[in-house]
Amino acid sequence: MSLIYFVRHGESIGNNQHENLPPEENMLSETGLFQAKQLGAHLENVVFTHVFSSPYIRAISTTQHILSESKASYRDDVIVVDSDIRERHMGIYEGKSIKVLAHAFISTGADFGWNPEGAETRQEVESRLESFLRRIGNIVDTGSEQKTILVVTHGALMIHLWCYLLERKEKYIFKNWKPEYLKVSKNTNYFLLAVEKLKGTAQPRELEVMVAHGSEHLVTQKDAFNRLVKDNKSLDSLKNCVQQ
């Protein structure tokens, strides 16, 4: 059995300003840097055998700060930057305020499968997620030793991942899942999954949720998006879609 930590990046400038900024501009805020270091300290005794990050600077920086707090030593090139775990492109809502995007999402009935004009489709997102999962599966299945894998990615991308794992029952058995887990995680919160090796070519692969929305490391449970929802009654219907 191997372990995978799926982590949402720390708070970014865009999160703090409630703006959907271009990836190259959307760096971690001071709060985000602190969150990443706090998570690193929380996981300081975990030795990661493999480390993956989205190519966006807010994810790479989060990964670097997590590893900087570890008691283990890592090579400078330990982080594998993987474009398959980047955030979903939202088409005409790129560069718009989060409030505008949230209202548009509400108008769909809070449908996570919503495809805005010009956006990356759900099918396109799931295709790259499957490519990433196959690479992770190859790592898990190679050799006899347990792997411990860190994956730093994004809130919406993680929602798509959980939906995909739940729906593709011919490929994955997603154990210990609860419906209330299907919410956008706060910044630097994590899911810990236990993953079984495949026996030969047999499918499906078993994955079990060990920790959902892990937040023990956070000094405060306040979150930029939660504040936006709390301060705008017009966004009340989103309270069930985000971790409180």
What spans do the regions from the language model cover?
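Short glycine/proline- and acidic residue-enriched helix-loop micro-motifs
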Residues: 105-124
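Glycine-rich phosphate-binding loop signature in dinucleotide/nucleotide-binding domains
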Residues: 45-47, 136-148
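Short active-site segment of divalent metal-dependent hydrolases/proteases
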Residues: 12, 157-158
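Phosphate-coordination/substrate-recognition cap region in phosphate-metabolizing enzymes
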Residues: 37-109
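Short, well-ordered beta-to-alpha junction loops that form the rim of enzyme active sites
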Residues: 54-56, 84, 147-156
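An N-terminal RHG(E/S)-centered segment typical of histidine phosphatases
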Residues: 1-48, 64, 68, 72, ...
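Acidic, low-complexity terminal tails and accessory targeting/binding regions
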Residues: 2, 88-99, 142-145, 163-244
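Beta-strand elements within well-structured catalytic alpha/beta cores of enzymes
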Residues: 3-7, 144-153
